[in-house]
Amino acid sequence: MRLILLGPPGAGKGTQSERLREQCKIPQLSTGDMLRAAVKAGTPIGLKAKAVMDAGGLVSDDIVVGIVADRIEEPDARNGFILDGFPRTVKQAEALTTMLHEKKMDLDAVIELVVDENALLARIEKRAKETLAAGGTVRADDNPAAFKTRIDTYREQTAPVSAYYASQGVLKTVDGMADIDTVTAAIDKILKA
């Protein structure tokens, strides 16, 4: 099972990815985690990423795609993976399609969690309160100003990725405003179809 979960910040991608990871016994691949691991491991692509990150730059699409390509070759990803935080742009989506084609792999599903942006801020604020109440640390970007920036960036750069996958005929949508178990059930239904 190879899949991508799309949706704006606060849509529940992390929650659903975690559930899918446990249910399908496949890794959840976060580009941020992969970048840090590649840098730590000193891989050729990790060294390129480190040079860019140390200089304060944004890691290029080519480097990110290279890190994803390396990661999906690891033994735990042989039976599939869930991409989390990637692709973020149409250019990355196109590069991923090319890379998977070269590896003779296909995506089984691209699922977008569709949510009401106005309700997302309330969801983010609730998550922050629950995290604090549980004694955890609130994400630095779980505040109204940062959230607005994140949602604007999503709208501008990442939302077009949905249109790209729709044009490929692989995009499925799920109502991300439903409760967590209902969203999980809707995703399961798509994956079993």
Swiss-Prot record:
Domain remark in the UniProt entry: Consists of three domains, a large central CORE domain and two small peripheral domains, NMPbind and LID, which undergo movements during catalysis. The LID domain closes over the site of phosphoryl transfer upon ATP binding. Assembling and dissambling the active center during each catalytic cycle provides an effective means to prevent ATP hydrolysis.
Name of the protein described by the UniProt record: Adenylate kinase
NMP, as annotated region: 30-59
Family matches, as NCBIfam families: adk, PRK00279.1-3, PRK14527.1, PRK14528.1, PRK14531.1, PRK14532.1
EC number, UniProt record: 2.7.4.3
Organism annotation: Beijerinckia indica subsp. indica (strain ATCC 9039 / DSM 1715 / NCIMB 8712)
Region feature LID, mapped onto this chain: 126-142
Organism superkingdom: Bacteria
Quaternary context: Monomer.
Subcellular location(s) of the protein: Cytoplasm
Pathway linked to the protein: Purine metabolism; AMP biosynthesis via salvage pathway; AMP from ADP: step 1/1
Residues annotated to bind AMP: 31, 36, 57-59, 85-88, 92, 139, 150
CDD domains reported in the protein's UniProt record: ADK
Binding-site residues, ATP: 10-15, 127, 178
Major site of localization recorded for this protein: cytoplasm
Function: Catalyzes the reversible transfer of the terminal phosphate group between ATP and AMP. Plays an important role in cellular energy homeostasis and in adenine nucleotide metabolism.
ATP-binding found in the keyword field: yes
One annotated Gene Ontology cellular component of this protein: cytoplasm
PROSITE patterns: ADENYLATE_KINASE
Species classification: Bacteria, Pseudomonadati, Pseudomonadota, Alphaproteobacteria, Hyphomicrobiales
Pfam families associated with the record: ADK
UniProt record, GO biological process: AMP salvage
One Gene Ontology MF term: ATP binding
